[in-house]
């Protein structure tokens, strides 16, 4: 009996020791670099990695990690999981990996990727900072914002919300195409001269505060020419092109306005903004509501000219609103 009891206690001690070792291995790590160039690798748990200064390479591996790259030209691969990545100052390359990640660029020219997302699900948040950033969304529903600098913002494969910054940015909707949603890609210009291209599906596009160029591409798009002299092209599909009244208008018929092209498809134009707009209908059976200051191409099938006699008539009419309606209007950066 004594020998059997000793054997039991010995086995209990071994199992307990193994459990403690396993628990220690499973614990998340806090990894801290120094001010030199570091090569830091996380564990398969929820790690916190602080690289500090220097040109660092960081591989966070799996799970939901928090990575702060610090100053320097850093390369971060966050790996699978719902990660929180901050680039810091310097020209960084930041990849969120698979999962819905939050990636923040710092000052510098950053290249940021959301990584492989989950189609039809919540995607990544990718936010640029000062510098000329190149931001690429993933496969989910991403939120992408530019900031100061000449940014290129690409939506990727999901239905995305993209907001330009205060400078001259390029926005691309990507391959998102979900016909169950009224508008898949939503592209919003900022305070600069932005160039926006819609995706393959139904897009919502709004120019910003300067002279913007917008192209809807394939799909039935809704395009708003906002403040400034914008050029809007609906492309293929049944598009709605809207010329909004500019806030700097002091007299009707006094400003050169927007240029709107419908492209192929049965398009609709709403252009009663009191400016001298150009309207090109293109193929299809199109409808135009314009004012007496607009130049409408003769190929437009159904044209209704509504006379405007005062600036108050322009600004008070719901059709001539001075900003685009959108469920996203409170989510983007304020110019």
Task: Write out the residue ranges for each language-model feature.
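Bacterial N-terminal signal peptides that target proteins for export
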Residues: 2-12
């Amino acid at each position: 009996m004594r020998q059997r009891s000793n054997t039991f206690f010995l086995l209990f001690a071994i199992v307990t020791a193994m459990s403690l070792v396993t628990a220690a291995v499973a614990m998340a790590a806090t990894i801290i670099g120094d001010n030199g160039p570091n090569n830091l690798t996380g564990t398969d748990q929820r790690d916190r990695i602080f690289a500090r200064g220097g040109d660092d390479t960081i591989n966070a591996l799996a799970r939901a990690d928090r990575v702060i790259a610090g100053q320097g030209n850093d390369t971060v691969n966050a790996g699978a999981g719902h990660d929180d990545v901050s680039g810091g100052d310097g020209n960084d390359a930041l990849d969120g990996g698979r999962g819905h990640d939050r990636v923040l660029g710092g000052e510098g020219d950053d290249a940021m990727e959301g990584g492989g997302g989950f189609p039809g699900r919540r995607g990544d948040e990718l936010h640029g900072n000062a510098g000329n950033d190149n931001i690429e969304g993933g496969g989910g529903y991403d939120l992408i914002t530019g900031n100061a600098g000449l940014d290129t913002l690409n939506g990727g494969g999901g239905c995305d919300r993209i907001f330009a910054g205060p400078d001259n940015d390029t926005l691309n909707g990507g391959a998102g195409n979900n016909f169950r949603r009224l508008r898949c890609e939503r592209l919003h210009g900022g305070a600069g001269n932005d160039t926006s291209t819609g995706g393959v599906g139904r897009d919502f596009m709004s120019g910003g505060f300067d002279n913007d160029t917008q192209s809807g591409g394939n799909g039935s798009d809704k395009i708003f020419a906002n403040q400034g002299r914008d050029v809007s092209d609906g492309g293929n599909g049944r598009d709605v092109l809207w010329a909004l009244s500019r806030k700097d208008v002091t007299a009707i018929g006094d400003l050169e306005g927007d240029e709107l092209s419908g492209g192929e498809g049965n398009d609709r134009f709403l252009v009663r903004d009191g400016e001298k707009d150009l309207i090109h209908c293109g193929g299809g059976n199109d409808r135009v509501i314009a004012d007496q200051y607009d130049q409408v191409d003769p190929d437009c099938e159904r044209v209704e000219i509504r006379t405007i006699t005062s600036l108050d008539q322009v600004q008070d009419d719901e059709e001539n609103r001075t900003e685009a309606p959108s469920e996203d209007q409170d989510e983007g950066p304020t110019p």
